[in-house]
Every structure is written in C-alpha cells, then in structure tokens.
C-alpha cells in the first residue's frame, strides 16, 4: 500500500486496520477521542453491555450540530475471497480497500479532520459540535446509539442538527442524502390447529389451510398510498414453518414471521389493529407478538438539508437527491432528540461485500463537505 497522502485518508486507514467486528470497537473510539480532546472536546464513554459508546462535545451553546456513526463493521466473510486482507487497508487502482472503508470508517475519519480544520479556523465558533459514536450498529443495536440517546434525554440534552455518516451515495459522492427512513414493524404469528393423520382430516384442523386465506388477504391489502416522502407501506412474509417433516401428519401449529416497512402515513398501532382485524375476521386461533425496531422519521427542506446540499454542490459540483429508501439506521433513535436528522456518506455499492472499497479521490472531498456544513451552520 502506498502511503496515504492526506490526513483523512491516513486516519481512515488507521481505523480500517482495527478489526472492529460488531460489537467490538478495537480501540477506534479511543483513537478518535485522542484526536478530539486537544480541540476542547469533553469526551464521555457510555459503555453498556459490552458495547463501546462515545459522546464527545465541544461547547455548551445552541445550536448543537452532531456527527453520528459507528465503529463496528460486519464480518468479513471468506478471507480467501478478498484480494487483500480485509483489515490491512490497501490502495489499489485508485480505491482504498478494507472492511469498513465505505461503511463507515472513511466517514468517521472525515468527521474528525473536518472538525480539526473547522476549529482551527473558527476557535470561537457559534453553538456546539458533538460526536455520537457506537460499536453496536451492525449487530442487534440494543446497547449503542439508543442507550446514548436515552442518557442524553434523561439529562435534557437535545440536538439541533445531526449528520449520520452512513454511505448514502449511489453512483458518485454527493448524489444522494437520506432525509428520513421508513419504520420497521415485525410480527411473530402462531396459528393453532389440531394435529392429526392426513387420512383423517375430519379429526384434525390444519392451521396452514386455515391461515392461507388470511395470508392472501394480508398480502393483497393496500395499507396506505404513501406520501411525498415515503412509498406505500409494504407487508412481507419472511418465514413460514409448520409440520413435523413427515408427509402423513397434519401439523398442529403454523408459525409465520412477517414485517412492515412503513412511512409517516400509517402508525405502528394502526397497522397492528388492521392486522388483528383481518386475522380475527378469518376466525383463527392465534398468538401474535410484535416488535417495533424503528419508527419512521423525516427531515424536511430545512437548514440542515440546505447546508449539506450547498456543501455538496460547492465541493463536488453535484446536485443531490433526497431519499428515504433502504433499511433502517441509527437515525431512527437520534430523531427522538433531534429535529433535523440526515444521513450522508460515500458510495455504498460495495458495503457488506468482500473487497469493500471507496474511491481514494472521494475521501478528502467527503471531509470537506462535512467541514462546509459546519461552517454554514456554526458561523455567523
């Protein structure tokens, strides 16, 4: 690997070299805190349940602009499928390769170097700057950002703006900002029947047969029409299981896992109620447990979207697109204490894949976009 030629690239390489497979942090937060402390940041570790969390803040005034992200990465997959070791950052053909290069250690490096330059140029800037970082985003995400948000809320700390460094760009750096995400509501359904011999169906009740019409109705249901920010709500079955494995036994139960992805038109409670109404109408004997892993959030065209969009245009000459597509992120937790939350980072085409990479010539511009956003929001 040739030596990194910019501070952001050097820090990205140092972070990638740390094997922080979720929920491990591998010293990434300590490294970042060591860079922030000399700038006047108060760095607070909020470690919970084996998860490493960092809340670092400079200043006490409003507005508060927070950069948020995660140090953990997904597992590498088969090592022999990588062209170079995943935790040995390698520059090849104009790209930086390594696990976390795009998701999201280059963003973390960009946060830090953007802040360093901004504070050097504006030591008496308006408002406050913060970083909220966790090692529990790629895993179960129960002891990470959500717990830090709870701790901040308990002591009355609120954010005005938050940029989550998720890799949102599609084809080129800056072409997409996520200004919201759909909610995710999962159901675990068990329909009860009566087990019996397939030759004597009159002595049994087949839960698969009883459930099938209800599933068809749920699949055909139009839950809402969406709105300007979100597509219509979707309902999908992810798993169905019934039976003993024998072909002569009618099963006694049928288990189904399903999921809603929903925007701001429908609420989780409304979707639950409509689901129960359909199941009840079919006369099923059932149990249904729910898990809401994230509520939808949306940030309109306010100050943060304008500042970030202008920063992208000034840095890379791209007119960005706002989108709410894709899965959930930690933005869903931060939205509880922050009025304006967006996600922005590098191209996501290689994330969670072998040979994950980011274009070398996108690393420094990413940091400059973050710096220009700081300047727009925290200088007079």
Swiss-Prot record:
Which GO terms are recorded in the biological process aspect for this UniProt protein?
diaminopimelate biosynthetic process; L-arginine biosynthetic process; lysine biosynthetic process via diaminopimelate
The gene name reads dapE
Task: Specify which residues bind Zn(2+) 1 according to the UniProt entry for this protein.
Answer: 70, 103, 166
Q: How is the cofactor bound?
A: Binds 2 Zn(2+) or Co(2+) ions per subunit.
What are the protein's UniProt keywords?
Amino-acid biosynthesis, Cobalt, Diaminopimelate biosynthesis, Hydrolase, Lysine biosynthesis, Metal-binding, Zinc
Q: Would you indicate the residue range of the signal peptide?
A: none
The pathway to which it is assigned is:
Amino-acid biosynthesis; L-lysine biosynthesis via DAP pathway; LL-2,6-diaminopimelate from (S)-tetrahydrodipicolinate (succinylase route): step 3/3
As recorded in UniProt, its EC number(s) are: 3.5.1.18
Q: Name one GO molecular function term.
A: zinc ion binding
* Domain of life per record: Bacteria
Recorded catalytic reaction(s): these are:
N-succinyl-(2S,6S)-2,6-diaminopimelate + H2O = (2S,6S)-2,6-diaminopimelate + succinate
Stored Pfam families: M20_dimer, Peptidase_M20
User: What is the protein named?
Assistant: Succinyl-diaminopimelate desuccinylase
């Amino acid at each position: 690997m040739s030596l990194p030629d910019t501070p952001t690239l050097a820090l990205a390489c140092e972070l990638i070299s740390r094997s922080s497979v979720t929920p491990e942090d591998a010293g990434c937060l300590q490294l970042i805190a060591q860079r922030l402390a000399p700038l006047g940041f108060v760095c607070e570790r909020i470690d919970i349940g084996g998860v490493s969390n960092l809340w670092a803040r400079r200043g006490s005034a409003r507005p508060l602009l927070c950069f948020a992200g995660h140090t953990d990465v997904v597992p590498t997959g088969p090592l022999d499928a990588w062209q170079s070791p995943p935790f040995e950052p390698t520059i090849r053909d104009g790209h930086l390769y390594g696990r976390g290069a795009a998701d999201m250690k280059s963003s973390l490096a960009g946060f830090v170097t953007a802040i360093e330059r901004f504070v050097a140029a504006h030591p008496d800037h308006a408002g406050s700057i913060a970083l909220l970082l966790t090692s529990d985003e790629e895993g179960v995400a129960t002891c990470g950002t959500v717990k830090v948000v709870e701790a901040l809320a308990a002591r009355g700390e609120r954010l005005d703006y938050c940029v989550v460094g998720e890799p949102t760009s599609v084809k080129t750096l800056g072409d997409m900002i996520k200004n919201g995400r759909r909610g995710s509501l999962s159901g675990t359904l068990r329909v009860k029947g009566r087990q019996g011999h397939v030759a004597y169906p009159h002595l049994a009740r087949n839960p698969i047969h009883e459930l099938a019409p209800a599933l068809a109705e749920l699949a055909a249901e139009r839950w809402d029409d969406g709105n300007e920010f979100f597509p219509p709500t979707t309902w999908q079955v992810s798993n169905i299981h019934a039976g003993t494995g024998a072909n002569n036994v009618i099963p006694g139960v049928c288990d189904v896992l399903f999921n809603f992805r929903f925007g701001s038109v429908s609420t989780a409670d409304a979707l639950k109620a409509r689901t129960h109404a359909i199941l009840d109408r079919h006369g099923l004997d059932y149990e249904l447990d729910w898990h809401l892993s994230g509520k939808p959030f949306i940030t309109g065209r306010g100050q943060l979207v304008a500042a970030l969009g202008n920063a992208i245009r000034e840095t890379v000459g791209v007119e960005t697109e706002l989108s709410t597509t894709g899965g959930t992120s930690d933005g869903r937790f931060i939205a509880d204490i922050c009025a304006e939350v967006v996600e922005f980072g590098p191209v996501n085409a290689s994330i969670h894949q072998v040979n994950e990479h980011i274009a070398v010539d996108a690393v420094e511009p990413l940091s400059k976009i973050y710096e220009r956003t700081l300047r727009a929001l925290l200088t007079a």
